């Protein structure tokens, strides 16, 4: 006699989890690399603020890559320094405001934003995707638009989808301001 339906489903889920885990890095391996990148980037004169983002900031057990966010008015200068970081073994992509490198056997992604959009970008790039969707839906219900650039009051705007920065910006310098604009307390990354 074969497996029952529930047992078969559990086996399928465990196999899928194992396959996904193979393509991902353990937090214990990825976090030290993220902290090294953070120390390096945070020490640059052109950097106003730097934070780990993504699943590492949310303290997930595994991560697909290392995400670091920087606030700076000098994006290209920061990108050049990041590509030249001593841990970098390969540059996968480098533009004016984002770059991806291989370091420590992992992909490390850097995003550089202007300082007054840092809070919005930190919230957005920390995720999770489901959390961000829920926040955007809450914003829409309040005639607001929420994205990685801030929260915008789009009441009275003919086409709120006409661009990323449409309407009057009401939040975005800090993460707390993003949640406050939606009448929510700041949600810790681990709960997102």
Placement of each model-derived feature along the sequence:
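Catalytic cores of large soluble enzymes that bind and process phosphate-bearing ligands
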Residues: 3, 7, 22-33, 70-71, ...
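Active-site nucleotide-donor binding segment shared across nucleotidyl transfer reactions
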Residues: 35-77
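Flexible glycine-/small-residue-rich
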Residues: 13-15, 70-72, 112-114
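Helical scaffold of the NTase/Pol beta-like nucleotidyltransferase catalytic core
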Residues: 1-51
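Non-catalytic nucleic-acid-binding/docking modules located in mid-to-C-terminal regions
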Residues: 6-11, 15, 46, 60-61, ...
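Acidic, metal-coordinating catalytic segment for phosphate/diphosphate chemistry
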Residues: 76, 80-192
């Amino acid at each position: 006699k074969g497996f029952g339906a529930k047992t078969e489903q559990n086996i399928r889920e465990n196999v899928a989890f194992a396959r996904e885990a193979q393509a991902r890095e353990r937090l214990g391996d990825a976090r030290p690399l993220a902290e090294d990148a953070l120390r390096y980037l945070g020490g640059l004169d052109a950097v106003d603020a730097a934070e780990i983002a993504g699943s590492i900031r949310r303290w997930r057990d595994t991560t697909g890559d290392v995400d670091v966010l920087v606030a700076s008015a000098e994006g290209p200068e920061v990108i050049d320094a990041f590509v030249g970081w001593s841990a970098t073994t390969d540059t996968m992509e480098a533009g004016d405001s984002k770059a991806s490198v291989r370091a420590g056997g992992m992909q490390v992604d850097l995003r550089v934003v202007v300082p007054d959009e840092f809070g919005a970008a930190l919230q957005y790039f920390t995720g999770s995707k489901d959390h961000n969707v829920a926040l955007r839906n809450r914003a829409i219900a309040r005639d607001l638009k929420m994205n990685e650039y801030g929260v915008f009051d789009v009441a009275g705007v003919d086409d709120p989808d006409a661009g990323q920065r449409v309407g009057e910006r009401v939040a975005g310098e800090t993460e707390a301001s993003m949640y406050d604009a939606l009448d929510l307390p700041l949600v810790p990354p681990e709960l997102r």
